[in-house]
Swiss-Prot record:
Protein residues bound to S-adenosyl-L-methionine: 126-127, 182
GO molecular function: rRNA (guanine-N2-)-methyltransferase activity
Transferase keyword on record: yes
Protein name: Ribosomal RNA small subunit methyltransferase J
Amino acid sequence: MVKPMHLFAVVDALEQAQQFQQVLASRDVSTELVQIEQLNARFLRHHPELALCVDLDGLWLSANGMKMQPDWQAEIPRLKRASLKSEMIARACQINEQPSLIDATAGLGHDSLLMAYLGAHVTLVERHPVLFTLLEDAKSKAENDPFLSKYMQRIHLIFQDAHYYLQQCNQDDRKVDVIYLDPMFPQRDQHHQVIKKQAQVKKQMQLLHLLLPEDGEMDLGDQLLPLAQQIASRVVVKRPKHAVFLNEQQPDHQWQGDACRFDAYFQISM
């Protein structure tokens, strides 16, 4: 159950904010719409609580003077530099074969956007109503972007718990080429020490942790791995370089980078 939130909106985006309020209400998220003059740094400092904001840039999350937005358009420079050879994630997920791929831990959707750009047909699964609404807004804006629009037909958003969605796929005998997992929790090394992240990533993670508290209801990813292995011929798990294996399961192959690695699990019979 999501706690009631403020929905701050500038005057020029008030109509859009009302639409977001209706969408969120349909997903059992209660918001109090507050019209303000400016959504600037000063306002955010004076309103440190977790809140949603709407301006001409769309919908975003704020807390403790920070803001977070999927903002797929900001990823365009990265996409233009990317290639099947240069991106480790592309090699790990065999994007050159244009696979059907489920991203069961969607997050902000940046990895899925990259994989769709490089040729994969991606289904993003997200259970949290606020994060899903943020992803919807990011995709909607991307559909109207001259550069991104042609890649959006390869991206499909599913508002559902990933564990339940994968169970349904298994029961319906639906198979995919790849399932991609990038669990938010836990991010600890073999000595159980918390792994340090870059400053910008830290800010995004702080807001995500406020939105998605690490409690008994949060799926830590360990439960997803064995389920994913029943559905996909290849399961790829993104981990910090020195993190423990997901579900304490040794991968069949690894791709190692400076800050992270990709652990791959193969099901040859599929």
